[in-house]
Curated annotation (Swiss-Prot):
InterPro entries: QueA, QueA_dom1, QueA_dom2, QueA_sf. The gene is queA. Monomer. It is found in: Cytoplasm. Its EC number is 2.4.99.17. GO terms for molecular function: S-adenosylmethionine:tRNA ribosyltransferase-isomerase activity. Keywords: Cytoplasm, Queuosine biosynthesis, S-adenosyl-L-methionine, Transferase. This is S-adenosylmethionine:tRNA ribosyltransferase-isomerase. Belongs to the QueA family.
Length: 345
């Protein structure tokens, strides 16, 4: 497969720069297994799912992970906390650092009262750092000193609005440097309607790292390597998925991160409870085992996220739907509109 196989033309003005208000006021492109696409509102989602279907959310919480501070010399430094090492909101992190000169091991960086000691350089701008606090104290320090790490295609400074809107309403586990954006459309009213219809829900956790935005280098898709991310499937989620399968209902993943979590946790014919790290690269040819339908946003041309969606819905059908969405002026990427896809195979 060539990278160019996953390209499409997108006018810059269709890249959503602000969230819609309210959250569920977005559009929904429905791509069934067969037949023409439908153009609906996201508020129609409960009517498009069946009683007994199971929605699987990612309950990770975006942290204000972008820090701007100084080195002991007074020079400016930026740090993006990418992945907690050891689980939870601990003190050791993998981070991306940017300064006028390479940051030396042993250097202590200062961020409005929060200190980070550089323990090791991993190359390509990545470092292992130890912060001077953890848990609730760290969460409070990041709320004060950190900024929400908006994606690079949102060409404005983060605002206080983003602290609320670049976060799902069910976010529970702090640790992500990017939001699981398919979940941003859901409101309490939508969840109540889903419950009234008999649609069930559960949650898994995958802490999204900045690798989600890194481009595929070269034109050969097979040579790309994903950055590993931490995930967890709790026993109650595994049990809910098994019960859904047993009654013949659909597992509906909310977002590509939920797909990667469930496919990574597949063991011996079922989704297994447990925690680990996954670098699973889902692309056309992947045999999906855990997921029947997918709610997702529109993704960047040539991105690994688009490749996952093409693998799930069929490359030709998905790219045709994207071209249709462009023609109909859908809004794209993190703050954009959504799709509901049935699995192609």
């Amino acid at each position: 497969m060539r990278l160019s196989d996953f390209d499409y033309e997108l006018p810059e003005e269709l890249v959503a720069q602000e969230p819609v208000t309210p959250r569920d006021a977005s559009r929904l492109l429905v791509l069934p297994r067969e037949g023409a696409a439908e153009h609906r509102a996201f508020t129609d989602l409960p009517d498009l799912l069946a009683p007994g279907d199971l929605l699987v959310f990612n309950d990770t919480k975006v942290i204000p992970a972008r820090l701007v501070g100084t080195k002991p010399t007074g020079g400016k430094v930026e740090l993006l906390l990418c992945e907690p090492l050891g689980g939870g909101l601990g003190s050791r992190w993998r981070a991306m650092g940017q300064a006028s000169k390479p940051i030396r091991e042993g250097t202590t960086l200062l961020f409005e009262g929060l200190e980070a000691r550089v323990e090791a350089s991993e190359g390509e701008g990545f470092y292992v750092v130890t912060l001077d606090r953890e848990g609730e104290a760290l969460e409070a320090a990041l709320a004060r000193a950190g900024r929400i790490p908006l994606p690079p295609y949102i060409r404005r400074a983060p605002s206080d609005v983003d602290r609320e809107r670049y976060q799902t309403i069910w976010a529970r586990a702090p640790g992500s440097a990017a939001a699981p954006t398919a979940g941003l459309h859901f409101t309490e009213a939508i969840l109540a309607r889903l419950a009234a219809r008999g649609v069930e829900r559960t949650a898994v956790t995958l802490h999204v790292g900045p690798g989600t935005f890194l481009p595929v280098r070269g034109d050969s898709v097979e040579g790309h390597r994903m950055h590993a991310e931490q995930y967890e499937v709790r026993p109650e989620a595994a049990a809910a998925i098994a019960a859904c399968r047993a009654r013949g209902s659909r597992v509906v993943a909310v977002g590509t991160t939920s797909v990667r979590t469930l496919e990574s946790a597949w063991r011996g014919g079922a989704v297994a409870a447990g925690a680990g790290r996954t670098a699973l690269f889902v692309r056309p040819g992947h045999a999906f085992r855990a997921v029947d339908a997918l709610v997702t946003n529109f993704h960047l041309p040539r991105s690994t996220l688009l490749m996952l969606v093409c693998a799930f819905g069929g490359t030709h059908r998905v790219l045709a739907a994207y071209r249709d969405a462009v023609a109909r002026r859908y809004r794209f990427f993190s703050y954009g509109d959504a799709m509901l896809l049935a699995r192609a195979d």
